[in-house]
Amino acid sequence: MARISGIDIPREKRVEVALTYIYGIGLTRAQSILEKSGVNPDIRVKDLEDSDIQKLRAVTEEFTLEGDLRRQEGMALKRLQDIGCVRGRRHRMSLPVRGQRTRTNARTRRGARKTVAGRKK
């Protein structure tokens, strides 16, 4: 297995797809990385030369990936919560952040239904 950015990428897949196994690299970014490094996107990872792997490592080092990216995203959410803005409060309460309705729907974000006992008459 080839190791890029501390991740073992699968040997049997095309390089273009295998790069997407790294957190922070999607298909578009994988294509741009391959274009910059001059590696053929249709080749399988197991058929890559060592020089090709070195080129890919050099290009991927320019990006924030894996743990650093996760930490950056977490700190951004924490900052929103600390300053007390609406987005931060919505994140803290596990509610939809971008203006979606919550009277109905939003089940994924709010979690399973909690039954509330009806009032006695």
Swiss-Prot record:
<dbReference type="GO" id="GO:0005829">
    <property type="term" value="C:cytosol"/>
</dbReference>
<keyword id="KW-0689">Ribosomal protein</keyword>
<comment type="similarity">
    <text>Belongs to the universal ribosomal protein uS13 family.</text>
</comment>
<feature type="compositionally biased region" description="Basic residues">
    <location>
        <begin position="100"/>
        <end position="121"/>
    </location>
</feature>
<dbReference type="InterPro" id="IPR027437">
    <property type="entry name" value="Rbsml_uS13_C"/>
</dbReference>
<dbReference type="GO" id="GO:0015935">
    <property type="term" value="C:small ribosomal subunit"/>
</dbReference>
<feature type="region of interest" description="Disordered">
    <location>
        <begin position="97"/>
        <end position="121"/>
    </location>
</feature>
<dbReference type="Pfam" id="PF00416">
    <property type="entry name" value="Ribosomal_S13"/>
</dbReference>
<keyword id="KW-0820">tRNA-binding</keyword>
<dbReference type="GO" id="GO:0003735">
    <property type="term" value="F:structural constituent of ribosome"/>
</dbReference>
<keyword id="KW-0699">rRNA-binding</keyword>
<dbReference type="InterPro" id="IPR018269">
    <property type="entry name" value="Ribosomal_uS13_CS"/>
</dbReference>
<dbReference type="InterPro" id="IPR001892">
    <property type="entry name" value="Ribosomal_uS13"/>
</dbReference>
<protein>
    <recommendedName>
        <fullName>Small ribosomal subunit protein uS13</fullName>
    </recommendedName>
</protein>
<dbReference type="InterPro" id="IPR019980">
    <property type="entry name" value="Ribosomal_uS13_bac-type"/>
</dbReference>
<comment type="function">
    <text>Located at the top of the head of the 30S subunit, it contacts several helices of the 16S rRNA. In the 70S ribosome it contacts the 23S rRNA (bridge B1a) and protein L5 of the 50S subunit (bridge B1b), connecting the 2 subunits; these bridges are implicated in subunit movement. Contacts the tRNAs in the A and P-sites.</text>
</comment>
<dbReference type="GO" id="GO:0000049">
    <property type="term" value="F:tRNA binding"/>
</dbReference>
<comment type="subunit">
    <text>Part of the 30S ribosomal subunit. Forms a loose heterodimer with protein S19. Forms two bridges to the 50S subunit in the 70S ribosome.</text>
</comment>
<keyword id="KW-0687">Ribonucleoprotein</keyword>
<keyword id="KW-0694">RNA-binding</keyword>
<dbReference type="GO" id="GO:0019843">
    <property type="term" value="F:rRNA binding"/>
</dbReference>
<dbReference type="GO" id="GO:0006412">
    <property type="term" value="P:translation"/>
</dbReference>
<dbReference type="InterPro" id="IPR010979">
    <property type="entry name" value="Ribosomal_uS13-like_H2TH"/>
</dbReference>
